[in-house]
């Protein structure tokens, strides 16, 4: 369940030197059989993989909204491809905003593949007026919301070159901010 941000929470944030808000975009695609969590098939059947994807999206976006109750965070689903908003919406926590992250448009040289979508998501969140932005894997439904609040506060309290990374044991990252 999402907590409610109080005026006292916001006053605390201002006292800590936190200005603005941090966007956290869960990288998402609509959970459809044959299109989501395909590396799990087999042993899962495509419809089971899609249901698992839907549950992960709901739980991960709920975690972002819970973190928003204790830190200046706005939750997004950074989705692709364009035109799938209506398919994605029922699988998100209520109040989660959507932002297109399909990697279309001009990109700096060397930004390819999924990196295009990550950069597009970050650019889109900054375009919404946020002071800081993160992208978050949809594969972390049990990530404590406290870690998201800490990441947001760290980004908002630093200078323009502040970075937050959530490293995975496999060498990848679950959070980039």
Please identify what each model-predicted range represents.
Residues 1-40:
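N-terminal nucleotide-binding beta1-loop-alpha1 segment
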Residues 27-32, 80-84, 169-171:
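Short glycine-enriched loops at secondary-structure junctions
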Residues 53-72:
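A short, N-terminal amphipathic alpha-helix
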Residues 72, 130, 159-161:
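Short, high-confidence coil segments that cap the C-terminus of an alpha-helix
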Residues 72-81:
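Short beta-strand/loop segment that forms part of the nucleotide-sugar
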Residues 87-132:
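Short phosphate-binding loop-to-helix
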Residues 134-136:
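Short aromatic-hydrophobic micro-motifs that form the base-stacking/packing surface
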Residues 141-170:
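Conserved donor-nucleotide/metal-binding helix-loop-beta segment in metal-dependent transferases, i.e.
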């Amino acid at each position: 369940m999402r907590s409610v941000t109080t005026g006292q929470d916001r006053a605390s944030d201002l006292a800590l030197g936190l200005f603005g808000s941090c966007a956290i975009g869960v990288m998402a695609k609509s959970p459809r059989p044959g299109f989501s969590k395909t590396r799990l098939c087999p042993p899962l059947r495509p419809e089971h993989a899609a249901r698992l994807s839907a549950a992960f999206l709901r739980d991960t976006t709920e975690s972002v909204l819970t973190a928003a109750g204790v830190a200046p965070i706005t939750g997004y689903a950074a989705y692709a491809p364009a035109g799938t908003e209506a398919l994605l919406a029922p699988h998100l926590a209520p109040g989660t905003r959507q932002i297109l992250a399909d990697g279309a448009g001009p990109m700096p040289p060397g930004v390819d593949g999924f990196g295009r979508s990550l950069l597009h998501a970050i650019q889109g969140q900054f375009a919404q007026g946020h002071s800081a932005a993160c992208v978050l894997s949809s594969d972390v439904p049990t990530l404590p919301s406290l870690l998201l609040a800490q990441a947001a506060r760290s980004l908002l309290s630093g200078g323009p070159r502040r970075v937050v990374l959530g490293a995975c044991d496999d060498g990848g990252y679950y959070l980039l901010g």
